[in-house]
Amino acid sequence: KILETVREGVTGYDIEEFFHGIYNSITESAHVFYLASEGDYKKRTIKLIEILSEWTPHNYLISSPKGVDNATEKDLLVEFVEDPLFSAWEYIIPLQVVACMAPQDLGINPDIPKDPNFHRRIGSKNMENMNNPYGVEDEKVNSI
């Protein structure tokens, strides 16, 4: 959802996959969100933040407070339930908030598509019975 609303490339990695070489892509402009649920990898995630903080100032930890000794103003510490079957749902909610708030801060209106005629041009949606919600008049597009 963040990719759609912020309109920048976004991807997620398991921490072990990240260790295999993804870390090489981190630059000063990278924004890294860490989901540190309880378990074996939480300590390693915190250590990873220490290391990557040398490369980018944009590190955001989402976690329960247990085991987080040096929280920053960029961290979101929440008393999650941390149930192994439920925690995936808990950690989705903060990312949904980021997806909602970030475009506002960046001056992006996600309700306005980059190309209002994209689906007509590519033929990805049946547009025959739809109104033209953006009021776009384009003979080439409307003739598809």
What are these regions (language model features)?
Residues 1-144:
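A SIS-like phosphosugar-recognition module
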